[in-house]
Amino acid sequence: MSYLRRCLPLAQQITLLNQPAAPVYSICRQRLFSTSSRSFTKTYLFTLDRPILQSTTSTLSGQHKIHTSAHHFKKRKIQEETQKHELDLLRYDIKALKDAPKPALYLGLAGLIPFVSAPLLMNVTGCYYPEVAFAQVAYGASILSFLGGVRWGFAIPENSPAKPDWMNLTNSTVPALLAWLALLFRDNITEAAVLVIMGLGIALHYDLALLPTYPSWFKALRAILTVVAVFSLVGSLINSSVYPHKSLVSQEP
């Protein structure tokens, strides 16, 4: 009966650790194996009323808990997928740029010429031209209106993943409104350029985070084009404070 004296205290400890749950029913079995000169005793402890995959105490001393339930694994998997999705948004799916259609890729890169040429011309000549800077801002305003129209047109088709709801259609009008406000600051190019930069950033945020339904290659292309356009506008703003101002149109006295 020595094996019963060994098992009963163990069962009592397990019962105390699992309170207020139902008591643990244990069955102790003894198997004797006889060899030439020794006998070996093996004691088995079976828990009948609790599943194996359950959040229990890892040791009898109660140091910490190990979560092994299926619900915990599922929740952890969802959290990992969410974090991975956020990281994908931060990377802007740059690797998918190689899948972009050639016309979209080439026309998008060619659309950067009006942005880049303005600060490049100022750096080469060593002068700041207000007319060139305003032409750059006006081009940026037209691009903002184009981006808003793209979102609107993407939500119109019946099979589109973006639905024509209030969120999609309302947010698509924000870039156009910022473009209109920028054009009102004709005599103050600095404020106009800041509005265009804000509009480009907001439009990119909508497309990548708030409304991430565009193809991966388009999001990658949008990110690259937006970054280059913003830096070009910032370059023109820096040139306005570095180089002397010179007008391209001769002013009559």
Curated annotation (Swiss-Prot):
Name the InterPro entries on file.
Answer: DUF3429
Tell me how this protein sits in the membrane: Multi-pass membrane protein
The record's section on PANTHER family has:
TRANSMEMBRANE PROTEIN 69
Q: Which GO terms describe its cellular component?
A: membrane
Kindly provide the name given to this protein in its UniProt entry.
Transmembrane protein 69
Q: Which residues form the signal peptide?
A: none
Q: Disulfide connectivity?
A: none
| Keyword Membrane attached | yes
Pfam family of the protein (one): DUF3429
Q: What is the lineage of its organism?
A: Eukaryota, Metazoa, Chordata, Craniata, Vertebrata
Q: Name where it's found.
A: Membrane
Q: Which residues cross the membrane?
A: 104-124, 137-157, 165-185, 192-212, 223-243
Native source species: Xenopus tropicalis
Q: Which UniProt keywords apply?
A: Membrane, Transmembrane, Transmembrane helix
